[in-house]
């Protein structure tokens, strides 16, 4: 068996499976460290009492020193995002002239991006990418009959981006040839006033989902088959 099949062997304890999937195969700074630079309120000057001493007046009252922090890191993140996506991405399709079917396909692709609000999503993705150094965008379908794409469709395509900025932990599993074997992510969701932690994993042919039950994990629903035979998402890091 290959590595990912061995890890996800149903005969193994679920806790062992998830522990193996959490072995991050890339080196990315943790958000707990990055946020201290990204959020200006966490900068050292906000609690500096050495170089910015409070002044004690003769009557004993204290005049607190001005501690002004500047969010240059957050501004830089915004500027880099603007450089990339302030002007929306324009896709160019070749070899479509004189081919009606190809033109219809190109229009359908553009409609998919339009109704997935890709321009807004790109700005969100770039902000998260430059701030937290990693993102994962997943594409999925919801069953909703529509004609948005120029033809009758039973499904609607949507996308969602996960990043450590939103409290989501990403766990890509990449082999020595830089091929992604699995993409996992862990997040907490409020269900009926209760905080529940979930763990999801996508492979080329299956989608797994577990939830934390006490100190252990238990499956949620059945394993979903992925007909695309590809992980339906894109992971980026820097």
Regions found by a protein language model. Name each.
Residues 131-132, 138-238:
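Structured, contiguous alpha/beta core segments that scaffold functional sites
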Residues 1-165, 174-178:
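Extended, helix-rich architectural segments
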């Amino acid at each position: 068996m290959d590595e990912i099949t061995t890890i996800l062997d149903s005969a193994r304890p679920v806790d062992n499976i998830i522990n193996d999937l959490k072995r991050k195969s890339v080196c990315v700074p943790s958000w707990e460290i990055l946020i201290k630079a990204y959020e200006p309120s966490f900068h050292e000057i906000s609690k500096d009492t050495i170089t910015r001493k409070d002044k004690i007046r003769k009557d004993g009252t204290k005049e607190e020193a001005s501690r002004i922090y500047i969010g240059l890191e957050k501004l830089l993140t915004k500027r880099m995002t603007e450089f990339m996506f302030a002007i929306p991405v324009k896709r160019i399709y070749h070899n479509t002239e004189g081919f009606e079917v190809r033109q219809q396909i190109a229009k359908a692709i553009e409609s998919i991006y339009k109704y997935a609000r890709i321009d807004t999503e790109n700005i969100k993705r770039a902000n998260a990418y430059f701030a937290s150094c990693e993102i994962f965008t997943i594409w999925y379908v919801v069953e909703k009959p529509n004609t948005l794409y120029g033809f009758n469709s039973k499904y609607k395509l949507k996308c969602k981006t996960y990043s450590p900025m939103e409290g989501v932990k990403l766990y890509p599993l990449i082999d020595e040839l830089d091929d992604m074997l699995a993409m996992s992510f862990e997040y907490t969701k409020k269900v009926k006033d209760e905080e529940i932690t979930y763990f999801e994993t996508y492979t080329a042919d299956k989608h797994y989902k577990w939830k934390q039950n006490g100190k252990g994990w238990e499956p949620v629903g059945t394993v979903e088959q992925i007909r695309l035979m590809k992980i339906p998402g894109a992971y980026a890091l820097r």
